[in-house]
Amino acid sequence: MTKISALGAGSWGSVLASMLADNGHEVALYAHRQVIADEINQDHTNLHYMKDWTLNPSVWASTDMGQVLKDCDVILFAVPTSAIRSVAKAVRQVLDENGRQPYLVSATKGIESGTKKLVLQIFKDEIYPDGFDKMIVLSGPSHAENTAQKDLTAITLASTSLDNAAKMQKIFSNDYVRFYTSNDPIGVQVGGAVKNVIAIAAGILAGLGYGDNAKAALMTRGLAEITRLGVAFGGQPWTFSGLSGIGDLIVTCTSVNSRNWRCGYQLGQGKPLDEVLANMGQVVEGATTVKAVYEICDKYSLDMPISASIYKVLYEGAKIDDEIKLMMSRQLGPEIRI
């Protein structure tokens, strides 16, 4: 039995915690709010995030991070990107006190605004400055709602150490979620982060009533943008043809379970961003990630017109119809160009 500390009692953190408990591991779940911790402990539900679903009753929750991290072998992070650094700082303080060096698994998908750093880079800054070997990223086409119902799912675990990725693979895998390993944590993180931006665009097209041709074109050209940024960051181009690339892009751009898609859909129907985000009730990672992506594109002169248009619509007041016209009137060129 492995002792796992899951940080973040949102939908994905709760589902992963329950799944790991199903696998026979001891799981403690950190919740930011006492009311959620109490509900999980008393009723084994988390109704604010997941309706009609019950957690494995062996999962226990607490707002005391020191208690949650006590004697843990693995720390699973499932908190918003905007909170990842502050949570990492708190984790480091606890680890300094107890002297443990657990594996760090990130299920967070995003790029930090301001620093433009990926999550494992933040872990290196705040927790393990000597290297990346004990850090693993978990990413792929995996909506919490489907995994909660034990729908068949495949996910990637990536680390600079394939041996450590394989150790996590054995801990996480079961008969309804299959995990694959990768030695490209950079590419896997970029795929998981930037697909959220493309999903907002996919939702906008759906909200405007565009059909299958437009959706397919958007996802394909969106994948080209993701690959372009990933390679610039040091990722391997073939990673983006896998689960954390095209796989995650497909599920996020085509499902009503996607918060980013739902955000875009409402924008396409004419609702302002502030109203959409207020009504969502959960974090829309793509709306934050696009800020970092836009700055990265400008800094490195990367051609990412879809991402740039989403940024302009969200934060510069650009009109959606005007951005679509600009997109379709761009200079003609070859399809394949990294």
Curated annotation (Swiss-Prot):
Reaction equation(s) it catalyzes: sn-glycerol 3-phosphate + NAD(+) = dihydroxyacetone phosphate + NADH + H(+); sn-glycerol 3-phosphate + NADP(+) = dihydroxyacetone phosphate + NADPH + H(+)
Binding site for sn-glycerol 3-phosphate: K109, G140, S142, K195, D248, S258, R259, N260
One Pfam match: NAD_Gly3P_dh_N
Binding-site residues for NADPH, renumbered to this chain: S11, W12, H32, R33, K109, A144, R259, V283, E285
Molecular function terms from GO: glycerol-3-phosphate dehydrogenase [NAD(P)+] activity; NAD binding
EC number: 1.1.1.94
InterPro entries: 6-PGluconate_DH-like_C_sf, 6PGD_dom2, G3P_DH_NAD-dep, G3P_DH_NAD-dep_C, G3P_DH_NAD-dep_N, NAD(P)-bd_dom_sf
GO annotations of cellular component type: cytosol
Pathway: Membrane lipid metabolism; glycerophospholipid metabolism
Single Gene Ontology BP annotation: carbohydrate metabolic process
PANTHER family tied to this protein: GLYCEROL-3-PHOSPHATE DEHYDROGENASE, GLYCEROL-3-PHOSPHATE DEHYDROGENASE [NAD(+)] 2, CHLOROPLASTIC
Purpose: Catalyzes the reduction of the glycolytic intermediate dihydroxyacetone phosphate (DHAP) to sn-glycerol 3-phosphate (G3P), the key precursor for phospholipid synthesis.
Name by which UniProt lists this protein: Glycerol-3-phosphate dehydrogenase [NAD(P)+] 1
Protein species of origin: Lactobacillus delbrueckii subsp. bulgaricus (strain ATCC 11842 / DSM 20081 / BCRC 10696 / JCM 1002 / NBRC 13953 / NCIMB 11778 / NCTC 12712 / WDCM 00102 / Lb 14)
